[in-house]
């Protein structure tokens, strides 16, 4: 197995632009293409997953709504949320299937939050990561030709109010939280968090990291 993992720090980006780049990357990759992680924050946007239902958008606003091809329901992205897109050739990993990749992503977040003294957990019936019943991380993937794209969105230090305009991930009344609710403001930093996410994800799947 090629165990190299390229990590790209992309900063603040338009959702649709990055989404289409992920599609192009996945459509054109071959057996020699190295797996990649894209770390990004997005301008404010609601994204509907393939299972998304219009009724879960409770209130219209100036925030655009984009119909995406990832799994899951509606969610919200904005600056102060660390998004980690995983462009992985699952076929390369002998003991990895889609469910196990989801578990690895959830455990990546659990281990990262544990470094801040936060006890978090996944739910078997609702992908993502939770703290005291509130959701801190959303997760949605798309698999094409055995390769993943999309990934996770971890709330760090953002305006959570637009989550009230939706039923997050299709769950009415689901409360959201973020790292800044539990730590000092200077600790709630996307760059610091992303470094921890990458380390734990690479450790879980046995990658060597190259940062670009």
Swiss-Prot record:
The keyword Metal-binding does not apply. CDD domains: LipB (cd16444). Pathway: Protein modification; protein lipoylation via endogenous pathway; protein N(6)-(lipoyl)lysine from octanoyl-[acyl-carrier-protein]: step 1/2. Residues 31-209 form the BPL/LPL catalytic domain. InterPro entries: aa-tRNA-synth_II/BPL/LPL (IPR045864), BPL_LPL_catalytic (IPR004143), Octanoyltransferase (IPR000544), Octanoyltransferase_CS (IPR020605). In the reaction, the free carboxyl group of octanoic acid is attached via an amide linkage to the epsilon-amino group of a specific lysine residue of lipoyl domains of lipoate-dependent enzymes. This is Octanoyltransferase. It comes from Haemophilus influenzae (strain PittEE).
